[in-house]
């Protein structure tokens, strides 16, 4: 009887342990997968500072190119493509959080004029859906539907990102006018060098926090190093912790300076930003332009016909 109770207790504890483990796995997996776009969203009300700098550059320190392509002009209540290109060498591998090498991911933030927003699914054509692929876009804030973020997504598949955009209609939105508007974009490839809390990631260079002699270098079991430096000023020891990923550049017994790089810089990615302009075109203005062009063409035709008629009259008078 006692053995049976013991078995039941063990079974109950094992079931509880497995359930808790599954819950922790699901929660952590979700938070990790959704973390990247949220970094900027949690820390900044607007991703574009007053200076024009996009805040993603605070974590992605290397400067890399990005390109955006939009139509020169669009009509109201029209779906169009905003194509963001984030070029990089597909052969490159980045340092992952565990110190291993892996493929680069990409992400982008698109800052549209007020009134422009992500097109609803039922307004997107099958051809455009095919270009978009399995990308999932979200608004930067529920109240800022004109600012869209996406990523991280595999860079090898999505180095070109197609945003489906719906233009506003001034007839229904009184704060929107038929004008030329700017569009801003930021795009990154690879992991950042600094987390939003100010701590370094393992995808950056680590510098010495003291000048002196490297007394000891201990390789940690899970990767990374502990570097003990004997301070040159008073001899006290300073320990610098290097996470897995960066390659060590110093050795024991070496004399180093303050802020001297202890590791290589493993970062192969970077962030870039760009801009474009788009005109919200008045349909009546387009119709007026077409009418004007048609009238000019008709006037030219009548002028040619009149000239030929005049030449015929002159020719008949000369023959007479």
From Swiss-Prot:
How many and how are cofactors bound here? Binds 1 heme group covalently.
Q: Which UniProt keywords apply?
A: Chloroplast, Electron transport, Heme, Iron, Membrane, Metal-binding, Photosynthesis, Plastid, Signal, Thylakoid, Transmembrane, Transmembrane helix, Transport
**Lineage, uppermost ranks:** Eukaryota, Viridiplantae, Streptophyta, Embryophyta, Tracheophyta
Mark the transmembrane ranges: 286-306
A GO cellular component annotation in the UniProt record: chloroplast thylakoid membrane
Cofactors that this protein relies on:
heme
The UniProt entry's sequence similarity note says: Belongs to the cytochrome f family.
Topology in the lipid bilayer: Single-pass membrane protein
Q: Which residues form the signal peptide?
A: 1-35
Q: What does this protein do?
A: Component of the cytochrome b6-f complex, which mediates electron transfer between photosystem II (PSII) and photosystem I (PSI), cyclic electron flow around PSI, and state transitions.
Q: How does it assemble?
A: The 4 large subunits of the cytochrome b6-f complex are cytochrome b6, subunit IV (17 kDa polypeptide, petD), cytochrome f and the Rieske protein, while the 4 small subunits are PetG, PetL, PetM and PetN. The complex functions as a dimer.
Q: Where in the cell is it found?
A: Plastid, Chloroplast thylakoid membrane
Task: Determine if Glycoprotein is one of this entry's keywords.
Answer: no
| Top-level taxon in the UniProt lineage | Eukaryota
* An example Gene Ontology biological process: photosynthesis
Q: One GO molecular function term? A: heme binding
Specify which residues bind heme according to the UniProt entry for this protein: 36, 56, 59-60
The entry's protein name is: Cytochrome f
Gene symbol of the encoding locus: petA
Q: Which InterPro entries match?
A: Cyt-f_TM, Cyt_f, Cyt_f_lg_dom, Cyt_f_lg_dom_sf, Rudment_hybrid_motif
Q: Pfam families attached here?
A: Apocytochr_F_C (PF01333), Apocytochr_F_N (PF16639)
């Amino acid at each position: 009887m006692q053995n049976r109770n013991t078995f039941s207790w063990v079974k109950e504890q094992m079931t509880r342990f497995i359930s808790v483990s599954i819950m922790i796995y699901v929660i952590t997996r979700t938070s990790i997968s959704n973390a990247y776009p949220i970094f900027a969203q949690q820390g900044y009300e607007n991703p574009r500072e007053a200076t024009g700098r996009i805040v993603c550059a605070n974590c992605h320190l290397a400067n890399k190119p990005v390109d955006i392509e939009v139509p020169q002009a669009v009509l109201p209540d029209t779906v169009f493509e905003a194509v963001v290109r984030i070029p990089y060498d597909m052969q490159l591998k980045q340092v992952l959080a565990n110190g291993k090498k892996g493929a680069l991911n990409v992400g982008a933030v698109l800052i549209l004029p007020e009134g422009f927003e992500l097109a609803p699914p039922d307004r997107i054509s099958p051809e455009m859906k095919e270009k978009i692929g399995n990308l999932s876009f979200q608004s930067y804030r529920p109240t800022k539907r004109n600012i869209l973020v996406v990523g991280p997504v595999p860079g090898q598949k999505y180095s070109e990102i197609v945003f489906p955009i719906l233009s506003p209609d001034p007839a229904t939105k009184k704060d929107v006018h038929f004008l030329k508007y700017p569009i801003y974009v930021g795009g990154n490839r690879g992991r950042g060098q600094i987390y939003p809390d100010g701590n370094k990631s393992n995808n950056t260079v680590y510098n010495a926090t003291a000048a002196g002699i490297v007394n000891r270098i201990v390789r940690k079991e899970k990767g990374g190093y502990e570097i003990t430096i004997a301070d040159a000023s008073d001899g006290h020891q300073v320990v610098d912790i290097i996470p897995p990923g960066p390659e060590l550049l110093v050795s024991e017994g070496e004399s180093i300076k303050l802020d001297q790089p202890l590791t290589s810089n493993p970062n192969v990615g970077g962030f870039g930003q760009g801009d474009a302009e788009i005109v919200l075109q008045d349909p009546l203005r387009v119709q007026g332009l077409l009418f004007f062009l048609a009238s000019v063409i008709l006037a030219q035709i009548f002028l040619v016909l009149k000239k030929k008629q005049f030449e015929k009259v002159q020719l008949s008078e000369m023959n007479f």
